[in-house]
Amino acid sequence: MRSLSEIIAPSSYWTLAGTIGLNTNIFEINLINLILVLGILFYYGKGVLINLLENRERTILNTIQDAEERHKEATEKLQRARLRLQQAEMKADEIRIIGLTKMDRERRDLVDAADNDLRELEESKNYAIRFEKQRAIEQVRQQVSRLASERAFESLNGRLTNEFQLRMIDYHIGLLRAMANKST
């Protein structure tokens, strides 16, 4: 049976281990060479690895700080945008209220103007009616006066005799003389 040392490293490899050197054949590497290589890598690679990790840590921290600053700026911009939105909504409400007020005022002015026009039309109509009424009354008066004059002339012509005409002429001549004497 074989010993444990022969299982781990056969006796053919012990001769190579006796000489100090590095076996580059990966299939022929024994445990000591492997530990030696790992130790050297660990000893010299530790500083490089630490530097890489520190650089990576700084990069991550800087990235986090930049992200936090961008988040803060974005939050501030969002707050400003919300404030502007709120102001815009207030301004829109104000404009809407002003528009509704103007519309209501214009509607009232239009209704008032229509009422005034209607009132003026009514007054004009009433004036025209009164004018036509006065004209009709005047025409009726003229007709009544004409008819009365015609009847009076007919009546006078029927009653007028020569003797009555002479008396009337004498009476009026007397009146004219009396007026002439008063004026002189």
Curated annotation (Swiss-Prot):
<keyword id="KW-0150">Chloroplast</keyword>
<keyword id="KW-0067">ATP-binding</keyword>
<comment type="function">
    <text>F(1)F(0) ATP synthase produces ATP from ADP in the presence of a proton or sodium gradient. F-type ATPases consist of two structural domains, F(1) containing the extramembraneous catalytic core and F(0) containing the membrane proton channel, linked together by a central stalk and a peripheral stalk. During catalysis, ATP synthesis in the catalytic domain of F(1) is coupled via a rotary mechanism of the central stalk subunits to proton translocation.</text>
</comment>
<keyword id="KW-0472">Membrane</keyword>
<dbReference type="GO" id="GO:0009535">
    <property type="term" value="C:chloroplast thylakoid membrane"/>
</dbReference>
<comment type="similarity">
    <text>Belongs to the ATPase B chain family.</text>
</comment>
<dbReference type="GO" id="GO:0045259">
    <property type="term" value="C:proton-transporting ATP synthase complex"/>
</dbReference>
<dbReference type="Pfam" id="PF00430">
    <property type="entry name" value="ATP-synt_B"/>
</dbReference>
<dbReference type="GO" id="GO:0046933">
    <property type="term" value="F:proton-transporting ATP synthase activity, rotational mechanism"/>
</dbReference>
<keyword id="KW-0934">Plastid</keyword>
<protein>
    <recommendedName>
        <fullName>ATP synthase subunit b, chloroplastic</fullName>
    </recommendedName>
</protein>
<comment type="function">
    <text>Component of the F(0) channel, it forms part of the peripheral stalk, linking F(1) to F(0).</text>
</comment>
<keyword id="KW-0066">ATP synthesis</keyword>
<comment type="subunit">
    <text>F-type ATPases have 2 components, F(1) - the catalytic core - and F(0) - the membrane proton channel. F(1) has five subunits: alpha(3), beta(3), gamma(1), delta(1), epsilon(1). F(0) has four main subunits: a(1), b(1), b'(1) and c(10-14). The alpha and beta chains form an alternating ring which encloses part of the gamma chain. F(1) is attached to F(0) by a central stalk formed by the gamma and epsilon chains, while a peripheral stalk is formed by the delta, b and b' chains.</text>
</comment>
<keyword id="KW-0406">Ion transport</keyword>
<feature type="transmembrane region" description="Helical">
    <location>
        <begin position="29"/>
        <end position="49"/>
    </location>
</feature>
<keyword id="KW-0138">CF(0)</keyword>
<dbReference type="InterPro" id="IPR002146">
    <property type="entry name" value="ATP_synth_b/b'su_bac/chlpt"/>
</dbReference>
<dbReference type="GO" id="GO:0005524">
    <property type="term" value="F:ATP binding"/>
</dbReference>
<keyword id="KW-0793">Thylakoid</keyword>
<keyword id="KW-0813">Transport</keyword>
<keyword id="KW-0547">Nucleotide-binding</keyword>
<keyword id="KW-0375">Hydrogen ion transport</keyword>
<keyword id="KW-1133">Transmembrane helix</keyword>
<keyword id="KW-0812">Transmembrane</keyword>
